[in-house]
């Protein structure tokens, strides 16, 4: 559970930390889209350099990014191997029964690997440099135009902020419950698949009870303080779009233009 970084924030004073969450969200969404424009080594090299620039500017240790990558290793390897084994290509370099590995399948597998890693790194930058409540405020502000069609933007923002706030708490509760069960002699690593599934039950039941208790306490606290959502509420911290946020958006626009031009030229 220590590898789960969602909802965790690393305090800092880097330029990435000081940016408006709306600009970081916009760049993150754009990055996920334009990564599919890259189809050769030069395109991925540009994306790698862009990501490395974000990592360096965030002034956060690379170990945090590697920790964020660990929970996804299984999915990444499965996808890469599947792509490598079942993608048809003209230049076959290995063949066994129905399995054929070609140069094209190897290249595609490497590209998919880079896509996963780069997206995870960029999302990790967003998570580690933006407090969860600030991130929720940014999403709420970004969804502001939807108020015109009666979408409850404030309520959605509140739900998101509460969810993000309690992710680290749930992770800590899970770790505490697992340690308590291990102290009672529970072994989560032995047995077949069915036994491993059954061993999760002693974790899930206390975790659900704890979660419902926390939710009830939060609801009572909000009611006792007279909380009322909707328009008219002000925020303690106001989001301010500054020149550095505009530069960040311009950088992703330039990256998009470069990838589009290169895809047409090549």
Swiss-Prot record:
Keywords, A to Z?
Cell membrane, Membrane, Transmembrane, Transmembrane helix, Transport
Main location per the UniProt record:
membrane
The UniProt entry lists membrane topology as: Multi-pass membrane protein
The record's subcellular locations are: Cell membrane
Could you state one GO cellular component term attached to this entry?
plasma membrane
What transmembrane ranges does the database entry give? Answer: 29-49, 73-93, 106-126, 151-171, 246-266
Taxonomy, superkingdom: Bacteria
GO molecular function per UniProt? ATPase-coupled transmembrane transporter activity
**Cysteine pairs bridged by disulfides in the record:** none
Q: What family does this belong to?
A: Belongs to the energy-coupling factor EcfT family.
General function of this protein: Part of a common energy-coupling factor (ECF) ABC-transporter complex. Unlike classic ABC transporters this ECF transporter provides the energy necessary to transport a number of different substrates. In this organism these probably include biotin, thiamine precursor, niacin, pantothenic acid, queuosine precursor, riboflavin and thiamine. Uptake of niacin or riboflavin into proteosomes containing EcfA1A2T and Niax or RibU has been demonstrated. Uptake requires hydrolyzable Mg-ATP and is substrate-specific; NiaX-containing proteosomes did not transport riboflavin.
> Subunit info?
Forms a stable energy-coupling factor (ECF) transporter complex possibly composed of 2 membrane-embedded substrate-binding proteins (S component), 2 ATP-binding proteins (A component) and 2 transmembrane proteins (T component). In L.lactis forms a stable complex with EcfA' and EcfT and S components. In E.coli forms a stable complex with EcfA, EcfA' and individually with 3 tested S components (BioY, NiaX and ThiT) with a stoichiometry of 1:1:1:1. The core ECF complex interacts with a number of substrate-specific binding components, including BioY, BioY2, HmpT, NiaX, PanT, QueT, RibU and ThiT.
The name this protein goes by in its record: Energy-coupling factor transporter transmembrane protein EcfT
């Amino acid at each position: 559970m220590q590898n789960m970084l969602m909802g965790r924030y690393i305090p800092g004073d880097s330029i990435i930390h000081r940016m408006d969450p709306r600009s970081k969200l916009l760049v993150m969404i754009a990055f996920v889209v334009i990564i599919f424009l890259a189809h050769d080594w030069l395109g991925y090299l540009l994306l790698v350099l862009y990501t490395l620039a974000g990592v360096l500017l965030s002034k956060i240790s690379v170990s945090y990014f590697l920790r964020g990558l660990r929970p996804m290793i299984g999915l990444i390897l499965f996808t890469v191997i599947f792509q490598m084994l079942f993608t048809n290509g003209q230049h076959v370099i290995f063949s066994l029964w129905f399995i054929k590995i070609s140069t094209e399948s190897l290249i595609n597998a490497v590209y998919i690997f880079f896509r996963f890693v780069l997206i995870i790194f960029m999302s990790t930058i967003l998570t580690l440099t933006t407090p969860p409540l600030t991130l929720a405020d940014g999403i709420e502000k970004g969804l502001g135009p939807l108020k015109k069609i009666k979408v409850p933007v404030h309520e959605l923002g509140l739900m998101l902020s509460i969810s993000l706030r309690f992710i680290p708490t749930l992770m800590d509760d899970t770790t505490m419950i697992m340690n308590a069960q291990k102290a009672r002699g529970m072994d989560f690593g032995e047995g077949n698949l069915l036994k491993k599934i059954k061993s999760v039950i002693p974790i899930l039941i206390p975790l659900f009870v704890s979660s419902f208790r926390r939710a009830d306490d939060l609801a009572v606290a909000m009611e006792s303080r007279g909380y009322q959502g909707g328009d008219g509420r002000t925020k303690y911290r106001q989001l301010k779009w500054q020149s550095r946020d505009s530069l960040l958006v311009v950088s992703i626009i330039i990256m998009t233009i470069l990838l589009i031009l290169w895809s047409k030229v090549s």
